[in-house]
């Protein structure tokens, strides 16, 4: 998360996350699921809605995979309508969801309620053995969350973009002894220091 994208209200919210709201801990648990449920490179399938493609989160997860050395965290962006001639990494369509299987993870990212066609595909992927993770907002999406093995809602006081940054950072954390030097709480504290001075 870049400091220039964080305003005063978000600084207050982020400080609240550090102060023990519980959300940061839930994000860490969710990040661990992102990190451990895909069993091979290419097995983390990231999909949004017809109106929202999670480009930025996919890029952040790719960075975290590279920095942490966790190959299975490298995401595959699944798109509703890839344009003709798109490069291979941007040409993966919904047929990939139909091929999802045990050992793969379908990560659904949506700021709005998931449309019925998406819910149907997600449910089918679960039936074939894929792990379903969901990131949404506010009080969550009841229908999507009921299908997901793990779901996390970004609080309304935090932008969805900021929430995606924090989730991707959590996914890149190593477990104790794994050698990752900067944990999620550390990274958030450094961000706040750069924006408004040291945290209490």
Language-model segments: which ranges?
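A charged, well-structured terminal subsegment
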Residues: 162-200
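Generic structural signal of hydrophobic/aromatic residues within well-ordered alpha-helices
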Residues: 10-14, 27, 34, 90, ...
């Amino acid at each position: 998360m870049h400091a220039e994208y964080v305003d005063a209200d978000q600084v207050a919210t982020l400080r609240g996350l550090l102060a023990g709201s519980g959300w940061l801990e839930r994000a860490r648990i969710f990040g661990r699921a992102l990190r451990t449920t895909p069993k091979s490179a290419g097995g983390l399938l990231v999909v949004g809605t017809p109106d929202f493609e999670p480009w930025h989160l996919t890029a952040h997860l790719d960075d975290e995979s590279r920095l942490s050395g966790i190959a299975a965290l490298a995401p595959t962006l699944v798109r509703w309508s890839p344009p003709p001639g798109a490069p291979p990494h941007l040409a993966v369509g919904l047929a990939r969801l139909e091929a999802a299987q045990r050992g793969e993870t379908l990560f659904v990212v949506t700021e709005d309620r998931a449309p019925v066609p998406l819910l149907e595909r997600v449910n089918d992927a679960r039936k074939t053995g894929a792990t379903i993770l969901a990131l949404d907002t506010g009080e969550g999406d009841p229908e999507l969350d009921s299908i997901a093995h793990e779901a996390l809602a970004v609080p309304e006081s935090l932008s969805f973009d900021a929430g995606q940054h924090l989730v991707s950072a959590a996914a890149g954390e190593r477990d104790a002894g794994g050698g990752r030097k900067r944990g999620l709480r550390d990274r958030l504290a450094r961000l706040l220091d750069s924006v408004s001075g040291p945290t209490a």
